[in-house]
């Protein structure tokens, strides 16, 4: 039972193998993966892979027993539109927590949920982590962690770090009410900032929500800020350059600047995003939905053009800006290590500041200070920013407050050295 031609990569059929579809030589696939790890390390980078602890392929029966699943009363009844003659009796609960025998076409009917009420499941999943860590994998992006007990992760992560202390764990956690739980109990190093920062940025771009909402999301995080992982795209979400989101790669620039420069959160880049990949192809199971399909064998147009050295002029512009901003965020000490002062509360709406479409903040480190203003409006703006003396005092700088005038392009951002 698969979705699309390739099937979901999150419907795990063997936790201890590499998909033959990813190998040049199917019979040599594990050796190829190990060589990839060595090449990556030689290049000074780390290898992070997905760990999918909540659900597996419905017909995965070589590692688990029936006690590792949730068994229901009665046979599985698949959606009629699938035309499947697959028989499963008793049915198992689906990966998205459907605890009845008739999942819908929108459910994860191709997966079954693992039973963490059974302690045996904990030990089996720990062995999966040990297997890949022993091969030199540096970290794990853990899928759908809120569907798995935080206590399991707290135990498993501590067990792995006892053997491999530098192993890194990222939590795909969506509900911001659970952020602290999966850091403090789950032991994760980084947490997706989905329902906070990402959802707010998307609402600003798509729904006209006020940029002032970003202040509340920032304040909500408190001491968790360095533990957050900002992103504008991932395999579940629509491409930011798609017609369903910002509409172009350039229109993403203010959100990119805020995601990279506002606080100390890390940032995740999804492949092709740096070229303004639009995800507007009809790709089988996924249909035309602004996403790059994970269910079918398909070409990502911008990636193909990049490999052939044929990027369009627009893609080169977007790529240059992503490269520049990523370099600033990681190599400029103000943004890599500095503190943040939010200027929104000192700047009420006026003729020269639209607090619903513009966002202003300062970053400071040692004796340097920088102003950043992002303009989410489709029109250029001449902006005046009020910087109070308290902002400079916050950074340990003795300087009077001032008003600064600057110009910001449509759907763009600007930076200004203040000290």
Regions flagged by a language model, labelled:
Residues 1-5, 50-60, 143-149, 172-176, ...:
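Short, solvent-exposed turn/loop segments enriched in Gly/Ser/Thr/Pro and often Arg
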Residues 1-131, 156, 160-162, 179:
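Substrate-binding/active-site clefts of carbohydrate-active enzymes
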Residues 9-30, 58, 107-122, 137-147, ...:
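The substrate-binding groove and active-site-proximal loops of carbohydrate-active enzymes
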Residues 15, 40, 50, 132, ...:
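Conserved, mostly hydrophobic/aromatic
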Residues 52-55, 124-150, 230, 234:
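Active-site groove signature of glycoside hydrolases
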Residues 75, 98-99, 158, 162-245, ...:
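Glycan-recognition surfaces
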Residues 213, 225, 231-234, 239-403:
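Loop/helix patches that line or flank the sugar-binding groove of alpha-linked glycan CAZymes
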Residues 407-419:
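C-terminal beta-strand-rich structural cap/linker in extracellular carbohydrate-active enzymes
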């Amino acid at each position: 039972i698969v979705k699309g031609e390739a099937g979901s990569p999150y419907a795990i059929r063997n936790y201890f193998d590499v998909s033959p579809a990813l190998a040049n030589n199917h019979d040599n696939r594990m050796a190829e993966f190990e060589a990839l790890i060595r090449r990556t390390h030689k290049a000074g980078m780390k290898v992070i892979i997905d760990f999918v602890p909540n659900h597996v392929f419905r017909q995965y029966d070589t590692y688990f027993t029936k006690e590792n699943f949730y068994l229901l009363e009665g046979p599985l009844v698949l959606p009629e539109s699938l035309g499947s003659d697959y028989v499963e009796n008793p049915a198992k609960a689906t990966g998205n927590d459907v605890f009845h025998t008739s999942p819908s076409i929108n459910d994860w009917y191709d997966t079954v949920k693992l039973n963490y009420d059974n302690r045996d499941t904990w030990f089996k999943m720990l062995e999966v982590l040990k297997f890949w860590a022993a091969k030199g994998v540096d970290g794990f992006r853990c899928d759908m962690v809120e569907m798995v007990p935080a206590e399991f992760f707290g135990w498993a992560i501590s067990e792995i770090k006892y053997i491999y202390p530098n192993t890194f764990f990222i939590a795909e956690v969506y509900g911001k009410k659970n952020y602290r739980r999966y850091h403090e109990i789950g032991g994760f190093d980084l947490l997706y900032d989905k329902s906070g920062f990402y959802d707010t940025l998307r609402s600003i771009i798509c729904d006209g929500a006020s940029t002032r909402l970003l202040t509340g999301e920032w304040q909500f995080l408190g001491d968790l800020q360095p533990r957050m992982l900002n992103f504008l795209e991932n395999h579940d979400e629509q491409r930011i350059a798609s017609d369903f989101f910002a509409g172009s790669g350039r229109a993403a620039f203010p959100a990119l600047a805020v995601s990279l420069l506002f606080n100390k959160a890390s940032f995740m880049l999804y492949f092709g995003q740096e070229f303004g990949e639009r995800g507007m192809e009809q790709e089988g199971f996924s249909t035309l939905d602004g996403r790059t399909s994970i269910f079918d064998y398909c070409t990502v147009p911008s990636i193909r053009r990049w490999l052939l050295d044929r990027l369009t002029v627009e893609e080169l512009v977007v790529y240059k800006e992503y490269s520049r901003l990523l370099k600033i965020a990681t190599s400029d000490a103000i943004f890599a290590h500095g503190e943040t002062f939010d200027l929104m509360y000192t700047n009420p709406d006026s003729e020269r500041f639209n607090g619903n479409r513009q966002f202003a903040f300062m970053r400071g480190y040692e004796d340097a200070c920088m102003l950043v203003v992002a303009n989410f409006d489709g029109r250029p703006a001449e902006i005046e920013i009020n910087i109070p003396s308290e902002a400079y005092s916050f950074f340990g700088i003795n300087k009077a407050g001032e008003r600064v005038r600057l110009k910001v392009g449509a759907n763009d951002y600007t930076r200004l050295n203040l000290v």
